From Swiss-Prot:
This is Cytochrome b-c1 complex subunit 2, mitochondrial. Disruption phenotype: Leads to decreased vegetative growth on several carbon sources including maltose, citrate and acetate. Pfam families: Peptidase_M16, Peptidase_M16_C. One of its GO terms (cellular component) is plasma membrane. It is found in: Mitochondrion inner membrane. It is a peripheral membrane protein. Induction: Expression is induced by interaction with host macrophages. Expression is repressed by nitric oxide. Expression is also decreased in stationary phase. Expression is repressed by HAP43.
Length: 374
């Protein structure tokens, strides 16, 4: 199912930058620049995260302070985020300010200065703080470890920068130069006229980007592994997670299974996992593969019992329960589909095996079970 918020067709300018837009009845425009092959799965571990912290800093056209103040006066918002597939720049603003933000985003991707003082005083501290905050959550640490043991490299790379893998400023700048090419960039907007958007993009710094880069880093082939286990000692709350690698063609099956047992996207008190404290499921979807995760978080003894119960729940879902969950799965997919990450997943009520899985325990390892004890 394709969300109503998603956009089907792209036009392009001569350097292969892809453009798509749909109009809306509101006065707001959501404009996103998606740089594919610039996510955490590509290049050195952490370099994409550091690059995301350089966006909206000083560039050849204007300073970060000037852009921030101008955006505040216009009432707009902006952010950058890194996913495993891409680096994404998001802006939201009033419709009449579309030319300003197209110009600003064009300068971000084509003209960032990569100043040494910004790297040391802003980029590294901000990235380290985000990494520390994320790793304070045992469920996040568990999901990261599940990706690592399931995919190893590529999609198994950590989402965020870690000081254990040193990265120089020159490496971030080079990664930007290699990945910020027209063939990798899609510009999508909700609440904008596509003809106007294409005109503004063609008049902006986006047109200075090369069509392609022969030296660009390529994502590694996606290999998956099962039967793996990892145990991570951690203070505070505990988390136990089961992960099943999923082919893109099977996304629909696992979305239905997730809806049937209880999904984090569409919480419901009537699902089986809702009866287990701290339990939920989610299908992480990427361009080349996915990872279906069943997790339980909370106090260690509750997690130890809960993960066993959650696994049993997933193994015992009936065909009738899957059929009844189709509509909920369609709604869940629609809720996950956004302007910057549109989904095209056809849900189907078919068996979604979980027999071949990976397992991660985070927290009090004296209490949390091993995989063969589930």
């Amino acid at each position: 199912m394709l969300s109503r918020a998603s956009i089907r067709a792209y036009s392009s300018i001569p350097n292969s930058v892809k453009i798509a837009a749909k109009e809306s009845a509101t006065d707001l425009t959501k404009l996103s620049v998606i740089i594919n092959n610039a996510g955490s799965k590509t290049g050195k571990s952490g370099v994409s995260h550091l690059l995301s912290k350089f966006t909206f800093l000083n560039n050849g056209a204007k300073s970060a302070l000037r852009f921030t103040r101008e955006s505040e006066l216009l009432g707009g918002t902006f952010e950058s985020k890194v996913t495993r597939d891409a680096l994404i720049l998001n802006t939201t603003f009033l419709k009449q300010d579309l030319p300003y933000y197209v110009e600003a985003l064009g300068n971000v991707v084509s003209n960032t200065q990569f100043a040494p003082h910004e790297f040391n005083e802003i980029v590294l501290p901000t990235a380290n703080a985000e990494t520390k905050l994320a790793n304070a959550n045992p469920a996040f640490k568990g999901v990261e470890k599940l990706h690592e043991i399931t995919f190893r490299r590529g999609l198994g790379n950590p989402l965020f920068y870690n000081e254990s893998t040193p990265i120089k400023l020159e490496e971030v700048a080079q990664f930007s130069k290699e990945q910020f090419s027209g063939e990798n960039i899609s510009i999508v907007a909700e609440g904008a006229n596509e003809e106007d958007l294409t005109k503004f993009v063609s008049e902006s710094a986006f047109c200075y980007l090369p069509s392609s880069s022969s030296n660009g880093a390529k994502a590694l082939p996606t290999n998956t592994f099962t039967g793996q286990e990892a145990r991570v000692p951690s203070s505070g709350a505990s988390s136990a997670l089961i992960g099943i690698p999923v082919k893109p063609a099977d996304f629909g099956k696992y979305e239905v299974l997730s809806a049937a047992i209880g999904t984090s996207t569409l919480p419901s008190t009537s699902t089986p996992l809702a009866q287990i404290p701290g339990a939920t499921s989610h299908l992480y979807k990427y361009q080349d593969a996915g990872l279906f995760v069943i997790s339980v978080s909370g106090e260690a003894s509750q997690v130890a019992q809960g993960i066993k119960q959650a696994k049993s729940v997933a193994e015992s879902v009936s065909s009738s329960a899957l059929s009844e969950a189709v509509k909920a799965a369609e709604l869940s997919v629609a809720l996950q589909s956004t302007v910057d990450s549109p989904l095209n997943v056809k849900v189907v009520a078919e068996e979604a095996p979980i027999s071949k899985f990976n397992y991660v325990a985070v927290g009090d390892l004296d209490v949390l079970p091993y995989a063969d004890e589930l």
